[in-house]
Swiss-Prot record:
Binding site for Mg(2+): 53, 166
NCBIfam families named among the record's database cross-references: nadE, PRK00768.1
The enzyme's E.C. designation: 6.3.1.5
Keywords assigned by UniProt, alphabetized: ATP-binding, Ligase, Magnesium, Metal-binding, NAD, Nucleotide-binding
Protein name (Swiss-Prot/TrEMBL): NH(3)-dependent NAD(+) synthetase
UniProt similarity note: Belongs to the NAD synthetase family.
The species this protein was found in: Enterococcus faecalis (strain ATCC 700802 / V583)
Length: 275
């Protein structure tokens, strides 16, 4: 009988070991194949935070676009990187370091604070009080609104940064950073993503940085591992089919079950995964 761990590994396509160079090539070719199949698409759009995931996805996207231009002679193929801070970002230096590494064709900066604060104000005027946690999700959704707005004006597709360690724990905002058109990191766990950045020659600080969602005003820069109650090493071991402690296994599988709704399109009468 298949265990839940085995089911999750199969579902997310995680391999116990990888060749980083091969996986880099696989992701770039995947992005290029999508563009070739959809010739009306000319850009990829991605928000760059300064964290491991957007840095990796951004560099892969830029490499794919560079190759598309070289192979087709079509100079309209462009990667658009967007900085999407809420006001002043505490780790802005990391974001700038990521952009310097990615070297995007186009770099934009859009402050989401006015839009988020205006919506919070409108809701409060209507008698709806917004918690800090809920406001954090609004920030994530405003970032996705912005990316799709830019993509819509530039014949673009939005790249998502979802990977296996994030997906299994559903550690993303529904219709926020969970909303995207294409996921070049899907199948990789956290340490494998780190290995790809090393292969690509990224500065060490960009892949050794402590991962954080940094969405809540009252709890700035809270580490993902603190919020999840489990380390990425344990999550990665689990996804590679290794034995982890009973506590870690239970925590990971509880997050997986709790977040099932995030992995599905809106529920219809024919869906039964939630029962």
């Amino acid at each position: 009988m298949t265990t839940l761990q085995e089911k999750i590994i199969q579902e997310l396509g995680v391999l116990p070991t990888i060749d980083p160079k091969e996986e880099v090539r696989k992701s770039i070719d995947f992005l290029k194949a999508y563009l070739t199949k959809h010739p009306f698409l000319k850009t990829f759009v991605l928000g760059i935070s300064g964290g491991q995931d957007s840095t990796l996805a951004g560099r892969l996207a830029q490499l794919a676009m560079t190759e598309m231009r070289e192979e087709t002679g079509d100079m309209s193929y462009q990667f658009i990187a967007i900085r999407l801070p809420y006001g002043e970002q505490a780790d802005e230096a990391d974001a700038q370091a990521a952009l310097a590494f990615i070297q995007p064709d186009v770099s934009l900066r859009v402050d989401i604070k006015p839009a988020v604060d205006a919506m919070v104000g409108s809701l409060e005027n209507a008698g709806v009080q917004i918690s800090d946690f809920n406001k954090g999700n609004m920030k994530a959704r405003q970032r996705m609104i912005t990316q799709y707005a830019v993509a819509g004006e530039n014949a673009g597709a939005v790249i998502g940064t979802d990977h296996a360690a994030e997906n299994v724990t559903a550690f993303f905002t529904k219709y926020g950073d969970g909303g995207a058109d294409i996921l070049p990191l899907f199948r990789l766990n956290k340490r494998q993503g780190k290995a790809l950045l090393k292969e690509l020659g990224a500065p060490e600080a960009l892949y050794l940085k402590i991962p954080t969602a940094d969405l809540e005003d009252d709890k700035p820069l809270v580490a993902d591992e603190v919020a999840l109650g489990v380390t990425y090493d344990a999550i990665d071991d689990y996804l590679e089919g290794k034995k982890v402690s009973e506590t870690d296994q239970q925590t990971i599988e509880n997050w997986y079950k709790k977040g099932q709704h995030k992995r599905h399109l809106p529920i219809t009468i024919f869906d039964d995964f939630w029962k």
